[in-house]
């Protein structure tokens, strides 16, 4: 069962529409779905909302510490409400996936993502769930820092928004702890429409 949904990003209007804030976009969409409002909570160093879903408390969190200190916010809330690592879902941008791709996984390395690195340290465990939202890769490692802090092109932003909407369909399963079903929902996308068959030509008829 997921009790704490965390979206990673950087605070401030200058970062609002940058690729690194894809996790914030996901939490904003979930807050709209649940009809709750994220409000500042100084004790947890972030914007937080709480909802009751099927009699269970669910927390939504956007750390306001800047990306590299995200664990400070996540750890503070998780410790206070006694939420275990396996009850946490962290939604973040993923360089290794193209815009439009989204994948769910549990555990593993931080892969160089500084937000995840700090969450590892503050939770004392890597055994939490991650929802990885594809933002694409600039092609060269030296360009990554600049890439994640830039706005995606409109067509890329639309693909990211589509992947967020698609993955949100699985949030009730995530909350209920039906992780296999959630994974299937998230990882299954509609296949592209098949192209109509070419009409036979006179040459092909001849064999």
From Swiss-Prot:
Site annotation Stabilizes the basic form of H active site to accept a proton: residues: 93
Annotated region described as Disordered, given as residue ranges: 187-207
Name of protein: Peptidyl-tRNA hydrolase
Sequence positions that bind tRNA: 15, 66, 68, 114
Annotated PANTHER family: PEPTIDYL-TRNA HYDROLASE
E.C. code: 3.1.1.29
One Gene Ontology CC term in the entry: cytoplasm
Family statement: Belongs to the PTH family.
Gene Ontology molecular function terms on file: peptidyl-tRNA hydrolase activity; tRNA binding
Low complexity composition-biased segments: 198-207
Listed PROSITE patterns: PEPT_TRNA_HYDROL_2 (PS01196)
Keyword Cell inner membrane (UniProt): no
Function: Hydrolyzes ribosome-free peptidyl-tRNAs (with 1 or more amino acids incorporated), which drop off the ribosome during protein synthesis, or as a result of ribosome stalling. Catalyzes the release of premature peptidyl moieties from peptidyl-tRNA molecules trapped in stalled 50S ribosomal subunits, and thus maintains levels of free tRNAs and 50S ribosomes.
Metal-binding recorded as keyword: no
Major location category of this protein: cytoplasm
Protein's organism: Delftia acidovorans (strain DSM 14801 / SPH-1)
EC class name: hydrolase
Signal peptide: none
Subcellular localization(s) per the UniProt record: Cytoplasm
GO BP terms: protein quality control for misfolded or incompletely synthesized proteins; rescue of stalled ribosome
Catalytic activity: an N-acyl-L-alpha-aminoacyl-tRNA + H2O = an N-acyl-L-amino acid + a tRNA + H(+)
Listed InterPro entries: Pept_tRNA_hydro, Pept_tRNA_hydro_CS, Pept_tRNA_hydro_sf
Entry annotation: catalytic residues: 20
Known partners and oligomeric status: Monomer.
Keywords tagged on the record: Cytoplasm, Hydrolase, RNA-binding, tRNA-binding
Site entry (Discriminates between blocked and unblocked aminoacyl-tRNA), positions: 10
């Amino acid at each position: 069962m997921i009790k704490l949904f965390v979206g990673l990003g950087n605070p401030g209007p200058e970062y609002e529409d940058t690729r690194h804030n894809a996790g914030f976009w996901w939490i904003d969409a979930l807050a709209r779905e649940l009809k709750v409002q994220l409000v500042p909570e100084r004790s947890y160093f972030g914007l937080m909302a709480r909802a009751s879903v099927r009699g269970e408390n669910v927390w939504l969190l956007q750390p306001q510490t800047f990306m590299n200190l995200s664990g400070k916010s996540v750890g503070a809330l998780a410790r206070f409400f006694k939420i275990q690592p396996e009850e946490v879902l962290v939604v973040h941008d993923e360089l290794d996936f193209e815009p439009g791709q989204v994948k769910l996984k549990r555990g593993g390395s931080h892969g160089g993502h500084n937000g995840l690195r700090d969450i590892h340290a503050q939770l004392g465990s890597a055994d939490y769930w991650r929802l990885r939202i594809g933002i694409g890769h600039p092609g060269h490692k030296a360009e990554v820092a600049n890439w994640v802090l830039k706005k995606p092109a409109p067509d890329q932003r639309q693909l990211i928004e589509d992947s967020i909407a698609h993955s949100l369909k699985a949030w009730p399963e995530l909350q209920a702890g039906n992780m296999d079903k959630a994974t299937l929902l998230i990882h299954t996308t509609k296949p592209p429409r098949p192209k109509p068959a070419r009409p036979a030509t006179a040459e092909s008829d001849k064999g």
